[in-house]
């Protein structure tokens, strides 16, 4: 399969930047479509970053990983969708009730301003966890992989549009879930890149051919001396025959 527009499958994380830095950076990557607004950027910019990104024709992936009681999660997702977030993360371990009401609230929020329904994504297990740390520190006695699978099932049954997982779990999850259930993965590195604080990583092409729907790119782009060239490199890498 050859992708018509590989840029649509890539999401750039602008962590560690303020609004001006983020906007300046995306101008360096003209083919960029999706931008991830995480905790750091949102904490410094608030909703201003939504307005600025959408004015530039970018799609917003709001990655705040909401995890609270159902009513609070519903309110947060309603407002996020109303402000134009097209992908929104929630922790799957918040439970079925919270996932169900958050998903419905997001649809209502978008509809209230004439926007299409966003896709809610259930966060499974953060890619910074190793299998040993996961079991030892959280005192969980089944495998990390089983936990990821269980949380992905919760998200799927609650009607969410996909989940966040490491590239190491993508192949197994794709065997379980249909293509319509998005598997979005951070932890993307080339062999000549460092691991930084990620523990479960994979190269772009390998993650994509394993079944990932979209890839979240961070430091392999933001730390590059030529971000546009680095982005193009990933686009070429995920093109499959």
From Swiss-Prot:
EC number(s): the record gives: 4.1.1.23
- GO BP: any one term: 'de novo' UMP biosynthetic process
Q: Name one GO cellular component term.
A: cytosol
- Asked if the record carries the keyword Lyase, the reply is yes
| Amino-acid positions noted as binding substrate in the UniProt annotation, renumbered to this chain | 15, 36, 63-72, 127, 189, 198, 218-219
What are the boundaries of the signal sequence? Answer: none
Q: Which InterPro entries did the record assign?
A: Aldolase_TIM (IPR013785), OMPdecase (IPR014732), OMPdecase_AS (IPR018089), OMPdecase_bac (IPR047596), OMPdeCOase_dom (IPR001754), RibuloseP-bd_barrel (IPR011060)
According to its UniProt record, in which pathway does this protein act?
A: Pyrimidine metabolism; UMP biosynthesis via de novo pathway; UMP from orotate: step 2/2
Which Gene3D superfamilies does the UniProt record give?
A: Aldolase class I (3.20.20.70)
Q: Name the reaction it catalyses.
A: orotidine 5'-phosphate + H(+) = UMP + CO2
- Tell me which residues this entry annotates as catalytic: 65
Q: Which Pfam families match?
A: OMPdecase
HAMAP family, from UniProt? OMPdecase_type1_B (MF_01200_B)
Function per UniProt: Catalyzes the decarboxylation of orotidine 5'-monophosphate (OMP) to uridine 5'-monophosphate (UMP).
The family annotation for this protein states:
Belongs to the OMP decarboxylase family. Type 1 subfamily.
Assembly and partners?
Answer: Homodimer.
What is the official name of this protein in its record? Orotidine 5'-phosphate decarboxylase
Which organism encodes this protein? Prochlorococcus marinus (strain MIT 9211)
From the broadest rank down, the organism's phylogenetic lineage runs: Bacteria, Bacillati, Cyanobacteriota, Cyanophyceae, Synechococcales
């Amino acid at each position: 399969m050859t992708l018509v527009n590989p840029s649509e499958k890539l999401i750039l994380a602008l962590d560690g930047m303020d609004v001006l830095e983020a906007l300046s950076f995306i101008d360096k990557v003209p083919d960029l479509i999706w931008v991830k607004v995480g905790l750091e950027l949102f904490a410094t910019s608030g909703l201003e970053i939504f307005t600025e990104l959408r004015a530039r024709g970018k799609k917003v992936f709001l990655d705040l990983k909401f995890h609270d009681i159902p009513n609070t999660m519903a309110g947060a997702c309603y407002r996020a969708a109303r402000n134009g977030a097209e992908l929104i993360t929630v922790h799957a371990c918040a439970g079925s009730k919270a996932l169900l009401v958050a998903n419905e609230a997001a649809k209502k929020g978008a509809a209230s301003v004439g926007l299409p329904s966003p896709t809610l994504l259930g966060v499974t297990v953060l890619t910074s966890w190793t299998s040993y740390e996961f079991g030892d520190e959280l005192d969980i006695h089944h495998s990390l992989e089983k936990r990821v699978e269980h949380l992905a099932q919760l998200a799927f049954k609650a009607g969410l549009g996909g989940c966040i997982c490491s590239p190491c779990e993508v192949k197994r999850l794709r065997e379980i879930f249909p293509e319509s259930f998005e598997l979005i993965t951070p932890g993307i590195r080339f062999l000549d890149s460092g691991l930084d604080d990620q523990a479960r990583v994979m190269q772009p092409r390998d993650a994509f051919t394993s079944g990932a729907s979209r890839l979240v790119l961070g430091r392999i782009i933001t730390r590059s001396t030529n971000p546009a060239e680095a982005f193009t490199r990933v686009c070429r890498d995920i093109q499959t025959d």
